[in-house]
Amino acid sequence: MLIKIGNLIYTLVLIPHVLTYLLKRHLFRYEVERWGEVLRLSVSPRNDVRLFLTLVRDIREFRTLFYYRLGPRYFLLRWLAPGMPTCFLHGSERQNVGRGLVIHHGHSMRLGAKHVGEDVEIWHNVTVGKKQSGGELPTIGNRVKICTGAVVLGDIHIGDDATIGACAVVLKDVPANSVVAGNPARIIRHNGQPCNVAL
């Protein structure tokens, strides 16, 4: 009984989030549907508000992305239901992160890039940023997957449909349709064919 009352109170706290979503639905609908597909939740055009409520209630990484997209003016929402405290999305321009970004287990995740393409997936303990103080940031293409513990640093370009393997250290450009792994990272698959090529 107490758990049901607690869930009801928490859902009521999220009413401002739902109202914000309804006002800015055109900005977030794709994001909500994408998270629903990736997490294998029920997705249909008629249940996007219910799906949004599920995501914003249960998934702190989604809340972090939602707040990032809204910007600092919506700090009250952040106060009512905090996002993931160790998941950092950097960039003063909200447009530098393409739509459809999905963050899996956002613990100790730091994303700072010139541009992040659409439908990118990132796992926990990932660092994307500058190689050195004052250095340049990476550019991430579309449909890129950056797996657990990977490090992507410097003025480099990660091509479309690339996968950065777990714990890979990437300091050079990664071609499109490639899988890289290791430290230093090497291409282990390109265009679906196994290989072993230095970056």
What are the roles of these predicted feature ranges?
Residues N183-L199:
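Short, basic/aromatic-enriched C-terminal tail that caps enzymatic domains
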Residues M1-T86, C195-L199:
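Terminal amphipathic alpha-helical/low-complexity segments used for targeting or macromolecular assembly
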Residues R78-G100:
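Right-handed parallel beta-helix
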Residues L70, P85-F88, G106, G112, ...:
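Aromatic-residue detector
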Residues D48-T54, Y68-R69, R73-F75, G91-E93, ...:
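Short, flexible segments with low predicted structural confidence
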